[in-house]
Amino acid sequence: VYTENGSQNLGRCGGITMAHEIDYQVYGEEMQFVEIQLDPGESVIAEAGAMMYMDDGIKMETIFGDGSERGGGGLGGKLLSAGKRLITGESLFMTVFTNQGQGKKQVSFAAPYPGKIIPIYLPQYAGKVICQKDAFLCAAKGVSVGIDFKRKLGVGFFGGEGFIMQKLEGDGWAFIHAGGTIHERVLAEGELLRVDTGCLVALTKGVKYDIEMVKGIKSVFFGGEGLFFATLRGPGRVWLQSLPFNRLADRILSQGGSSGRKEEGSLLGTIGNLIDGD
């Protein structure tokens, strides 16, 4: 369903068990947003602060966890769900948007930085996709947003971009965001791919992933590629991003903090020199 043009065809999710049925359309090129169309009584969950606009008749409610527990879940289940989000560094709370009006209503969610929104229909991937902890944007209510545990300590603590991964499970649509250009790769059985940890966005549950330390002291100290790779072994599908947010932020900070005062033709440096009288 994912395309490279400015918008997408309307997608439909047939909620088999738990997830609400939703329609959607993605707009834009490099600064995208997704518009969700809800029938009366349908809901969508989203990260706090992701909402762009919503029609009159949409009720917004902040909840513990993701609201995927059957029958609303008890206090223990809600605390467990919220605690899992806390481990990934996310907020304890999520926001639910429900159509309580008459007829179809729209609510939209915007990407936090330049890149692409990737719609994922979970039943196409055996009901489970693992993604970077900051990638999740929104999903049909009923989709569970949890964490993916790894037995090896190194994966959780030495992954650079954050290799405590989020786990999306259910039978509906989920939407994730990634920076720059998105590359989708299908790995054959046993095929191995080494990826910068920050460039990994998501993978299907058949893909085995781990952390591998960069070999060679010269590569470690002078390669500029970080100390670790993510190793991905098929079969399955992986989504990669060309511009991780931490890489973008580092470049902006380095240019604004140091090179702006150097005589390199920097606009910031020139303005600063004029103000200082240099």
Predicted regions and their residues:
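Short, Lys/Arg-enriched N-terminal segments with co-localized hydrophobic residues
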Residues: 1-17
